[in-house]
Amino acid sequence: IPAGDQIIDVIPQEFTVDNFQNIPNPIGYSGVKVGANFHIITGDKTAIRNINRAVEKSGLKTKDLMLQPLASAAAVMCDQDLEAGVAIVDIGGGTTDLAVFYEGILKHTAVIPFGGENITNDIKSGLGVLKTQAEQMKIQFGSALSDEARTNTFITIPGLRGMAAKEISVKNLANIIQARMSEIMDFVSYHLKQIGLDNRMLNGGIILTGGGSQLKHLIQLTEYVTGMNARIGFPNEHLCGGHTEELTKPMYSTCIGLILKGYNDFEIKFNSF
């Protein structure tokens, strides 16, 4: 474990019982020697302490911690995805989180240190606008593929304190967004190659979720960079009828996943009595 980190979760991947290998669940087997491979998730002690302190200040108590892409995966994945093998790519504000499932087992997790906030800052510095303007342009006019942006379309940005208005090319905006999103997807490809899983192994492809996944043409860029099928993951797999439509947006995947985690833990505890 890295210095300054602590274990958040220990997830079993597979078991061995004597000469029997790759056993997902050892219950029912008999033998002399039992072994296992585990996926250990760690986190920075200071960050964990700050999270606990923030929760306690709100009058609540932290029961458990869960890695963001695992929470999102719980909200957007179904049993078929788990069986087929998928990569969950959760594009948040500060980071992009990756969780890879193969043969029903969590095989890999990673945190890529770039997210939607980096794109906003790139637009701010590249086009010389305010951060609020950069965020608004990204949401309203942004595209992850510059080839899909209209060459002769411009956005008018009001001038500051009497200065003349500024004309921003939609094409230039898309070029900036594509550069950063391509970098993020290159990291995703790198991690998948490192663990030996690609489009031939992950038949379910890539599931994009999180607030950053709402960028136009992101699916096409992801498929181009990674060579894998991609789709947007909506957190509606486990929502009951009559739910608020707002909750089905990808930006709420982590929140829905955490609620599911809490509910499932309560149900297990309740049924044990």
Give the positions of each predicted feature.
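Feature representing long, continuous alpha-helical segments
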Residues: 121, 175, 179-186, 190, ...
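Conserved phosphate-binding/catalytic loops in two-lobed NTP-binding clefts
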Residues: 225-255
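Nucleotide/phosphate-binding catalytic cleft detector across ATP-hydrolyzing
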Residues: 1-88, 105-106, 116, 129-176, ...
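Phosphate/pyrophosphate-binding loops at sites that engage ATP/ADP/AMP, CoA/4′-phosphopantetheine
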Residues: 185, 189-205
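Residue-level signature of catalytic and energy-coupling elements of molecular machines
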Residues: 55, 90, 123, 188, ...
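Glycine-rich phosphate-binding loops at beta-strand->alpha-helix junctions
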Residues: 43, 143-145, 200-225
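Residue-level detector of high-confidence beta-strand sites
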Residues: 109-111
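A short acidic Gly-Thr/Ser loop motif
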Residues: 88-95, 101-104, 113-117, 210-213
